[in-house]
Amino acid sequence: MSAFGNPFTSGAKPNLSNTSGINPFTNNAASTNNMGGSAFGRPSFGTANTMTGGTTTSAFGMPQFGTNTGNTGNTSISAFGNTSNAAKPSAFGAPAFGSSAPINVNPPSTTSAFGAPSFGSTGFGAMAATSNPFGKSPGSMGSAFGQPAFGANKTAIPSSSVSNSNNSAFGAASNTPLTTTSPFGSLQQNASQNASSTSSAFGKPTFGAATNTQSPFGTIQNTSTSSGTGVSPFGTFGTNSNNKSPFSNLQSGAGAGSSPFGTTTSKANNNNNVGSSAFGTTNNQSPFSGGSGGTFGSASNLNKNTNGNFQSSFGNKGFSFGITPQNDANKVSQSNPSFGQTMPNTDPNISLKSNGNATSFGFGQQQMNATNVNANTATGKIRFVQGLSSEKDGILELADLAEETLKIFRANKFELGLVPDIPPPPALVA
């Protein structure tokens, strides 16, 4: 037997069943208020606390995480806050996120971790049962913009006896009497009011109203009053010509007024027309000829014997353009022929013969050759015919003219700049 004894041999053994002994690795807290500590100064981690009203703390200063705290009146503190309905503060100073609020507490009085009610409550104002979150109720009072909401019924029961005291930005309502002023004028569907008594923003009744008031464009002429009584800036209509118009009176009525364009001369039974016109009158008097001369293109029917003593404004022989005086054949005409006309032969002592050649100027006047001239030619009673030599002209012979001049006279036509200044000899004309 060794000095230390044999542990495997019979002998004295440690009494492990002694409950009063102290085990450094275990702690049998079977008694009430067992304050026995472990080798580390605290109960071992994970020790079950089954005592009523236990105040045992863990090694970290707080009850261990997940500790069963089902005992009544548990005052233990969790590191992450209470896990019961006890009103104790958590480690972060606010109830845990997602904690259920008490049933008897009103939702608006509950505050969240951010100082406001939790999300899901009426956070933008009072509840809808009390007021509108965006202002007042449209049916009872005005909107948030100072007027009732657009399209809202401002009057519960439309009636003609109820005055609309609400001013709208677009004028008064159409279903109430027009007691308010509209910037666009009064509405015209109210039959009880006089349409012409209301005023528009433009100074006159609106379009389509009664026309018994003055118009800025003149009086309307289709009223039931006497026609043409109102003065229009454009003149009156043709129903009454007694009023003055800036464009003269219409000629459908009596021509009592003067016109700036002259009066019409188509009046019946008026042989002596003394009315003057700025453009002339139609009384067969021409301002371009004197006496009984006609106007342009008109022929004078002279049935009496005349001596041709009327004067013309364009000459002393008395003719008008395009007029052929038909005088007596017994008298010799002293007038010149008109353009394009052939004067008849009124002198029986003169025998004329046509040459058959074309005229020099193309006016249709034929060249005449005198064959039998009696003593009347000496007195100057023969008329002048273009192309024939007169008694004042000297008789030229062919020998007196140069060869170049004879070629010019024998040619069918003259060339420009090569016309002789002397008449042709009678031998070339015959």
Curated annotation (Swiss-Prot):
Q: Which organism is it from?
A: Saccharomyces cerevisiae (strain ATCC 204508 / S288c) (Baker's yeast)
Question: Which of the residues bear the PTM Phosphoserine?
Answer: 137, 298
Q: Where is this region: Interaction with GLE1?
A: 365-430
For this UniProt record, give its keywords in alphabetical order, as a comma-separated list: Membrane, mRNA transport, Nuclear pore complex, Nucleus, Phosphoprotein, Protein transport, Repeat, Translocation, Transport
Localization? Nucleus, Nuclear pore complex; Nucleus membrane
Low complexity bias located where?
45-68, 186-201
How does this protein lie in the membrane?
Peripheral membrane protein
Q: Name one GO biological process term.
A: NLS-bearing protein import into nucleus
**What are the ranges of the SAFGXPXFG repeats?**
38-46, 58-66, 90-98, 112-120, 143-151, 200-208
From the UniProt entry, list the residue stretches annotated as the region Interactions with CRM1 and GFD1.
121-230
Stated role: Functions as a component of the nuclear pore complex (NPC). NPC components, collectively referred to as nucleoporins (NUPs), can play the role of both NPC structural components and of docking or interaction partners for transiently associated nuclear transport factors. Active directional transport is assured by both, a Phe-Gly (FG) repeat affinity gradient for these transport factors across the NPC and a transport cofactor concentration gradient across the nuclear envelope (GSP1 and GSP2 GTPases associated predominantly with GTP in the nucleus, with GDP in the cytoplasm).
What does the record's free text say on domains? Contains FG repeats. FG repeats are interaction sites for karyopherins (importins, exportins) and form probably an affinity gradient, guiding the transport proteins unidirectionally with their cargo through the NPC. FG repeat regions are highly flexible and lack ordered secondary structure. The overall conservation of FG repeats regarding exact sequence, spacing, and repeat unit length is limited. FG repeat types and their physico-chemical environment change across the NPC from the nucleoplasmic to the cytoplasmic side: SXFG/PXFG repeats are especially abundant in NUPs on the cytoplasmic side.
From the UniProt entry, list the residue stretches annotated as the region Disordered: 1-68, 180-294, 319-346
Question: What stretches of residues are SXFG repeats?
Answer: 2-5, 78-81, 168-171, 182-185, 215-218, 232-235, 259-262, 277-280, 312-315
List the InterPro entries.
Nucleoporin_NUP42 (IPR051767)
User: What's an example of a GO molecular-function annotation for this chain?
Assistant: structural constituent of nuclear pore
Record field: compositional bias (Polar residues): 15-36, 209-230, 237-252, 260-285, 323-346
Q: Where are the FG repeats?
A: 124-125, 134-135, 296-297, 319-322, 339-340, 361-364
Q: What is the name of the protein in this document?
A: Nucleoporin NUP42
Q: Subunit structure, briefly?
A: Component of the nuclear pore complex (NPC). NPC constitutes the exclusive means of nucleocytoplasmic transport. NPCs allow the passive diffusion of ions and small molecules and the active, nuclear transport receptor-mediated bidirectional transport of macromolecules such as proteins, RNAs, ribonucleoparticles (RNPs), and ribosomal subunits across the nuclear envelope. Due to its 8-fold rotational symmetry, all subunits are present with 8 copies or multiples thereof. NUP42 interacts with the NUP82 subcomplex.
